Amino acid sequence: MTRPPVTDWSTDFDHLDPRWVENPYPIWDELREKCPVAHTERFRGVYFPSRYEDVRAVAYDTENFSSRRIIVRETPPPRIPAPPITSDPPEHRPAKNLLLPAFTPDAIKQHEQPTRDICARLIDRFAGKPGCDAAIDYAQEIPVRVIAVMLGLPESEGDRFRKWIHEILEAGITRPDILMKAMGETSAYFQAEIDKRKSEPRDDLITQLSRATIDGQPITEDHLLGALRLILIAGIDTTWSAIGSCFWHLAQHPEDRRRLVNDPALIPTAVEEFLRAYAPVTMAREVIKDVEIGGCPFKTGEMVLLSFPAANRDPRMFPDADRVVIDRKENRHAAFGLGIHRCIGSNLARMEITVALQEWLKRIPEFHLDPAARVTWSEGTVRGPRKLPVLLG
């Protein structure tokens, strides 16, 4: 379906507009100076704060903004819980505490070598060839496999998981039928896996969460299915998008790439800068009480597009915000969110991104964009390259 063209980004923005999808940064820069809190009647009314302080204010305000709807969609579906990301206080804290043990630094350390092995096997497939798609052949494969192992699922299910992610996070924004079909399929899939573990428990996250309790009571089936769906979707798409954006940058900036090849110790610092500059995740909040943020009134019932990527490009917060400085010293970016919903998987994501870069640069120090092919980007909640054709060597 053809979408009506945007007439004015301040009063009629559309985050699915091809210009926004392809290169949102100039649009955000313009809004930050001209209209720091934009509004559109599309999607039944949405606000877009573009300054760090306003994004932060909304993220921390759980009295006036709810997380029960975290994606701006054309037609709001029935409420689909995915605790803790869709939970408000007081339910949020116990739901988050259930997942935290699996994502501590010590817990993630155990997954580092298996992640290196995954990266090495993937690189074996295209090392020595003239080129590859750094998104499809590499970035999109890593988190799928890592999360599958954590959940106790076959790595071979990757295509199925990628299909669901596309349907839920992209196609489902404007097609509620596609969304609800995918949600039903994920629920049925996870229910079957839960049933298997009742008779054959395993050392995996599905088994652990199946036994979880809150205040001494087993969590509900809806809670369990929602939490597993969250781990699958949020644990895969966000990280592969971040990894892909790193390679998109390095394929165009040989000076940065060579610095990292010559000084691998700089990679973790560079990862933080890539996360700042190319943060993948934009969340949403629902206005539940009339309130004013940044001098702009927010009306009950409308949505807020909570863009951590836009906040990370605010020059009031980050000097040279539009420059990628891979050895940036002070970098309090918001790539993993702000407030109570800050991403619990940040340790895992950082590890995967760092390992993905280390293993690739060790074996493929030279690569650049394929001038005969086109980079394409995802649209909607998570931004990252969907296709990233590169030439090797």
Language-model region placement:
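Cytochrome P450
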Residues: 1-393
